[in-house]
């Protein structure tokens, strides 16, 4: 083989790769769609992965510049950004069969071929099967059973807060709330029997998933997908990256529970005790997810088998652990901050708690009566949407949405920040913390305008558990304390993050109160 031939082949391969990346980078230019161009190969991915400036806020800035519909490229992905509520509703709900995939980084694996796929990443009939099985965990009956465990963790947190604030110190409530949510979800997703608050080593592993900087790794994986798959395969064997380290821990937890169940011949009570038991009850060695990938998702009345592979059991527990940790802690942190800087609103919440509970026990049935607290939580999530970067979809079949043609393979990213701060949708007081805007029972005029938990069939499955956790803890906290700002309180909050939008800290003073 001559040197000239080798050089010619090498040059042809290089030219082919270069042409491919230039085709992606110029995609929106050729379509006549406005948007930030970024750089060849990378697009705007490096900007979106900056920890110090959340991608959510960058989208808001670009929407002001380019309008409510524009396009960008991030690595090998072509992304259409949408900040129009009618289009959001069309994509998430009316045309769900054309947009049932989700925007993923290649390091998360191929959702159609990968064995280790959880509900967030799954698509098609595999997603439907996982969703059907998982939804049992969040029924009203299941939540009622969970209430006792959630409240036990809430009371344990109050004991730690009492110790830490005995001298009048201000504390970072974000850290305390993370301990609380990990304690709750650790009991449900890891089979933890007792509280491990402030002594659970897994907390730091999970914090690192959300707070650690993995910009270069994520960038390389998304720009060069084959490298992402290679790194994924390698890190499952040698888990060093926090997410894979946590997955490895979860594998050990599930294996231990399987061994326990085999010794005890099943769960003692004959019914699921936690998420692990629920998923293990559905475990089967005969799950064929490759067949699901071949099915036409638009088909109706196709039988959904309620079975999980062993890897899917681990994946579901892993997802529920990370999903239940960060977002609920962040929501509680934002509510606390907003109540501290708005004492009159805080007093209304306290009055409602006194009216509904007084000095009596916090009953599950009465949590639904905390209507004003509902409004406060909703408004906090409007002002500070959390994991809204997850409000994305993959176009599975070329279609037209409100006159905009979207080709198969294009990703759609909803600009939640712009939707939540649009004065045309919310009024000129859009930047104000105004819980009363939620006091009416009438549905929102614009159905795609509010996306704290997503929308449509892929809406966050753990939403009701998250709200219950917040209501129980806030009720106990505000029975005993008043949130006040101090010299360590950042006003306004400094927001950071990429996967989720987090405050750097939420220091407040908790003044004891007599009920």
Curated annotation (Swiss-Prot):
Residues bound to heme: 460
UniProt-listed Enzyme Commission number(s): 1.14.-.-
A Pfam entry, by short name: p450
InterPro entries assigned to the protein according to its UniProt record, in alphabetical order: Cyt_P450 (IPR001128), Cyt_P450_CS (IPR017972), Cyt_P450_E_grp-I (IPR002401), Cyt_P450_sf (IPR036396), Cytochrome_P450_3A (IPR050705)
CDD domains: CYP3A-like (cd11055)
Keyword Iron in annotation: yes
Gene Ontology molecular function: heme binding; iron ion binding; monooxygenase activity; oxidoreductase activity, acting on paired donors, with incorporation or reduction of molecular oxygen
Cofactors: heme
Main function: Cytochromes P450 are a group of heme-thiolate monooxygenases. They oxidize a variety of structurally unrelated compounds, including steroids, fatty acids, and xenobiotics.
Family: Belongs to the cytochrome P450 family.
Record's protein name: Putative cytochrome P450 CYP13A2
């Amino acid at each position: 083989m001559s040197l000239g031939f080798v050089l010619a082949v090498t040059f042809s391969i290089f030219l082919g790769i270069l042409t491919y990346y230039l085709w992606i980078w110029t995609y929106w230019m050729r379509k006549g769609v406005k948007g930030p161009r970024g750089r060849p190969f990378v697009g705007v991915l490096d900007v979106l992965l900056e920890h110090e400036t959340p991608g959510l806020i960058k989208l808001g800035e670009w929407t002001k510049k380019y309008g409510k519909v524009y396009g960008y490229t991030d690595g090998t992905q072509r992304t259409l950004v949408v900040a129009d509520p009618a289009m959001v509703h069309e994509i998430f709900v009316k045309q769900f069969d054309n947009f049932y995939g989700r925007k993923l980084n290649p390091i998360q694996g191929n959702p159609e071929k990968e064995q280790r796929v959880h509900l967030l990443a799954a698509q098609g009939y595999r997603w439907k099967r996982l969703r059907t099985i998982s939804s049992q965990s969040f029924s009203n009956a299941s939540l009622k059973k969970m209430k006792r465990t959630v409240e036990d963790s809430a009371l344990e947190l109050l004991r730690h807060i009492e110790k830490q604030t005995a001298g009048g110190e201000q504390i970072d409530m974000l850290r305390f709330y993370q301990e609380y949510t990990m304690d709750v979800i650790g009991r449900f997703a890891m089979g933890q029997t007792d509280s491990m608050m402030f002594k659970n080593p897994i907390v730091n592993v999970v914090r690192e998933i959300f707070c650690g900087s993995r910009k270069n790794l994520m960038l390389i994986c998304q720009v060069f997908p084959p490298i992402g798959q290679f790194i994924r395969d390698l890190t499952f064997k040698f888990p060093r990256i926090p997410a894979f380290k946590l997955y490895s821990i979860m594998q050990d937890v599930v294996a231990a529970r399987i061994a326990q169940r085999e010794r005890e011949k099943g769960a003692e009570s004959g019914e699921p005790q936690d998420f692990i038991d629920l998923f293990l009850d559905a475990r089967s060695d005969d799950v064929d997810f490759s067949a699901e990938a071949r099915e036409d998702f638009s088909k109706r009345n196709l039988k959904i088998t309620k079975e999980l592979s062993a890897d899917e059991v681990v994946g579901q527990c892993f997802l529920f652990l990370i999903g239940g940790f960060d977002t609920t802690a962040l929501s509680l942190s934002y509510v606390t901050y907003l109540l501290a800087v708005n004492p009159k609103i805080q007093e209304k919440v306290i009055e409602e708690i006194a009216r509904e509970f007084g000095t009596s026990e916090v009953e599950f049935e009465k949590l639904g009566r905390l209507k004003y607290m509902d409004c406060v939580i909703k408004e906090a999530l409007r002002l500070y949407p959390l994991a809204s970067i997850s409000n994305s979809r993959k176009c599975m079949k070329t279609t037209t949405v409100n006159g905009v043609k979207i080709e198969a393979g294009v990703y759609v990213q909803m600009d939640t920040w712009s939707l939540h701060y649009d004065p045309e949708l919310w009024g000129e007081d859009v930047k104000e913390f105004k819980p009363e805007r939620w006091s009416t029972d009438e549905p929102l005029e614009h159905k795609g305008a509010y996306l704290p938990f997503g929308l449509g069939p892929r809406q966050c499955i753990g939403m009701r558990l998250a709200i219950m956790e917040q209501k129980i803890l806030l009720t106990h906290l505000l029975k005993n304390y008043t949130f006040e700002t101090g010299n360590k309180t950042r006003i306004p909050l400094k927001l950071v993050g990429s996967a989720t939008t987090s405050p750097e800290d939420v220091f407040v003073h908790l003044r004891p109160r007599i009920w």
